[in-house]
Swiss-Prot record:
Origin: domain of life: Bacteria
Known pathway: Glycolipid biosynthesis; 4-amino-4-deoxy-alpha-L-arabinose undecaprenyl phosphate biosynthesis; 4-amino-4-deoxy-alpha-L-arabinose undecaprenyl phosphate from UDP-4-deoxy-4-formamido-beta-L-arabinose and undecaprenyl phosphate: step 2/2; Bacterial outer membrane biogenesis; lipopolysaccharide biosynthesis
Pfam families in the cross-refs: Polysacc_deac_1 (PF01522)
Organism: Escherichia coli (strain SMS-3-5 / SECEC)
Protein name, UniProt field: Probable 4-deoxy-4-formamido-L-arabinose-phosphoundecaprenol deformylase ArnD
């Protein structure tokens, strides 16, 4: 039996309003629990359109057929009109998710974090995280115990900024296994549970055809020598490609693969490491990557 952490990122208003309810229904039918990370502030995702001037981002949008994948309402959100606030407008949906699944913070403003957090000072970052946590806690009526940085934009500054919130774990980076990042003080910080597997948009049209993706991913899962963690998006697997996700769950069950919330992957002593800026194939720009202590 292979155990895989299932992380669901919710980036947008539409993903929350339409994608999450569909995913909740699918997961309920398959008796699966997951970790769901919500963006709760303004939906300004359309402001990423300026990145089309960057060849790597333009190629990603073209090969993933972004207009069909996400819809124009997502691609233009927050451009010609102010971005709608996501959290309180979809409070009932978020509360329903929290009844059955582990719920954490993705971001206050997903676009702002992904585009600008790498240049923020520590206090700006702390204030942004606090605003998101406070909003999500108001919605579900209980403390938030986990978070996942938008776009995996995380480095030592993010690790230090989140430490003061005393969360159970964060999932801010890409890597191979859970670990404890070293703080500037030399002490181990809050556990990190990295995502180990590629997302749909990172490989479709580059390494894999859409119809071959599930078989390709299951092969990666079964060969994973670390602690496999897979991320889906409410805007993708909860909308245009929900049938592909259902097929993945059915095929995974046949292969003895089970999915679980990320917290179930925490156990015993964790190795030490760091979160450093790096790059991965299929994703434009830098992102947080696990570095085992003592390695370079």
């Amino acid at each position: 039996m292979t155990k895989v952490g299932l992380r669901i990122d919710v980036d947008t208003f539409r993903g929350t309003r339409e994608g999450v309810p569909r995913l909740l229904e699918i997961l309920s039918k398959h008796n699966i629990q997951a970790s769901i990370f919500f963006s709760v502030g303004p939906d300004n995702m359309g402001r990423h359109l300026w990145r089309l001037v960057k060849p790597q981002f333009l190629w990603k949008m073209l090969r993933s057929n972004a207009a069909s994948l996400y819809g124009w309402d997502i691609l233009l959100a927050g451009t010609a009109w102010p971005g709608k606030e996501i959290g309180h407008a979809n409070a009932d949906i978020i509360r329903e998710a929290a009844k059955y699944h582990e719920v954490g913070l993705h971001a206050w403003d997903h676009h702002a974090w992904q585009a600008h957090s790498g240049n923020w000072d520590r206090q700006t970052m702390v204030d942004d995280i606090a605003r998101g946590l406070r909003t999500l806690e108001e919605i579900i009526g209980q403390p938030i115990t986990c978070s996942a940085a938008a776009g995996w934009r995380a480095d030592q500054q993010v690790i230090e900024a989140k430490e003061g919130f005393h969360l159970r774990y964060n999932s801010d980076c890409r890597g191979v296994m859970p670990f404890r990042p070293l703080l500037d003080s030399g002490k181990p910080g809050t556990a990190q549970i990295p995502v180990t597997l590629p997302t749909w948009d990172e490989v479709i049209g580059r390494d894999v055809k859409a119809e071959d993706f599930n078989g390709w991913l299951l092969n990666r899962i079964l060969r994973d020598k670390g602690t496999p963690v897979y991320t889906i998006h409410a805007e993708v697997e909860g909308c245009a490609y929900q049938h592909n996700f259902v097929d993945l769950l059915k095929r995974a069950a046949q292969e003895g693969v089970t999915f679980c919330p990320l917290s179930e992957l925490l156990s015993g002593m964790l190795p030490l490491g760091q979160v450093v800026r790096g790059n991965i194939a299929g994703r434009e720009g830098w992102l947080g990557c696990q570095q085992i202590a003592g390695s370079r």
